[in-house]
C-alpha cells in the first residue's frame, strides 16, 4: 500500500504591529489568501484550521494562520486582551499579506471577521463563518453574569472543551459591547457563507439567520447542519467547510 505523505508545515513566523508580536504560519500559494480566525480561547493549531491548511497545501493555495495576542504561541496576558485588540491583530494579519483575502472565522472569530471586513472592505473578498457569534457579549451572558463582571471584573466558568476555565474579563465584555453589530444593517457587500450546526448548545443557529438578514450583501448563504454541534469538527463537517471555501474561491 502506498503511504500518504502529510504536507509540510509552514515554518513558524511573526507578525509585528503596534508593539505586538503575533505567532503565525504562512503558506505560499495562489490567492486569495485564506486567513483563519480562531474562536475564543482557541488558536491556530485547532482541527479546522490545520485541516484547511492541509487542503491549501494540496491545492497550492495561499493561507495564513495566526494566534491573537495572549493566545496560543503569541506572547501576552490573555486576561489583558479585548475584542478590539483581536480585531486589530486581524487587521495586522491582513496587512501582512498582498492581495485579497478570504476570512474564515470560527465562533468569536466570526465576529472578528465581520469587524475586519468593515475595516478593510477593499481587501476582504469573501467571508466564511462557522457558528459565527457576533454580539455574544450581549446575548451570551445573563444579567446576573453581567452584573458580576461589573462588580468583580471577571468571571470564570468550567469549559466543556478543556481543563482551563472559561474566563471573561470586564474589559473584554465592555469592548464587545462597544463593537456590537446586530442592531443595524452591517455594511458588508462581499460574498458570505455561514455554516451552523443545529445541535449547537453555545450559539443558537437562528443567529446565523439573523446575521444573514442584517448583512447588506446580496450574496449570502446559510447552511444548517442538522446533527452538527458548535465546533462542527466531525469529518463530514470539515469536508463541508472545505467544499464551501473551494466553491467561494472559485467565484472570486
What are these model-predicted stretches?
Residues 31-39:
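Short beta-strand element of the alpha/beta-hydrolase
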Residues 1-28:
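N-terminal cap/lid segment of alpha/beta-hydrolase-fold proteins
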Residues 40-53, 206:
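The serine-hydrolase catalytic nucleophile loop
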Residues 103-105, 130:
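Short beta-strand immediately N-terminal to the catalytic nucleophile in serine-hydrolase-like folds
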Residues 8-9, 123-225, 229-252:
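The alpha/beta-hydrolase serine catalytic core
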Residues 105-113:
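Gly/Ala-rich beta-loop-alpha elbow adjacent to hydrolase catalytic centers
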Residues 53-75:
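Conserved alpha/beta-hydrolase
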Residues 71-97:
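Catalytic nucleophile-loop/oxyanion-hole region of alpha/beta-hydrolase
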Amino acid at each position: 500500500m502506498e503511504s500518504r505523505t502529510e504536507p509540510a508545515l509552514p515554518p513558524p513566523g511573526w507578525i509585528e504591529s503596534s508593539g505586538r508580536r503575533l505567532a503565525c504560519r504562512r503558506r505560499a500559494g495562489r490567492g486569495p489568501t485564506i486567513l483563519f480566525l480562531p474562536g475564543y480561547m482557541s488558536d491556530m493549531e485547532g482541527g479546522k484550521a490545520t485541516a484547511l491548511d492541509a487542503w491549501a497545501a494540496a491545492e497550492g493555495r495561499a493561507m495564513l494562520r495566526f494566534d491573537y495576542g495572549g493566545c496560543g504561541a503569541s506572547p501576552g496576558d490573555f486576561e489583558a486582551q479585548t475584542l478590539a485588540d483581536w480585531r486589530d491583530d486581524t487587521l495586522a494579519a491582513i496587512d501582512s499579506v498582498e492581495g485579497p483575502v478570504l476570512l474564515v472565522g470560527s465562533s468569536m472569530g466570526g465576529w472578528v471577521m465581520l469587524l475586519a471586513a468593515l475595516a478593510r472592505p477593499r481587501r476582504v473578498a469573501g467571508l466564511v463563518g462557522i457558528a459565527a457569534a457576533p454580539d455574544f457579549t450581549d446575548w451570551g451572558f445573563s444579567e446576573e453574569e453581567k452584573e458580576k463582571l461589573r462588580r468583580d471584573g471577571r468571571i470564570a466558568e468550567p469549559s466543556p472543551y478543556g481543563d482551563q476555565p472559561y474566563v471573561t474579563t470586564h474589559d473584554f465584555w465592555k469592548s464587545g459591547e462597544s463593537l456590537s453589530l446586530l442592531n443595524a444593517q452591517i455594511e458588508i457587500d462581499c460574498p458570505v457563507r455561514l455554516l451552523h450546526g443545529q445541535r449547537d448548545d453555545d450559539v443558537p443557529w437562528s443567529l446565523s439567520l439573523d446575521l444573514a438578514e442584517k448583512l447588506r450583501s446580496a450574496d449570502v448563504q446559510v447552511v444548517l447542519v442538522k446533527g452538527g454541534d458548535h465546533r462542527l469538527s466531525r469529518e463530514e463537517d470539515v469536508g463541508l467547510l472545505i467544499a464551501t471555501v473551494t466553491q467561494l474561491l472559485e467565484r472570486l
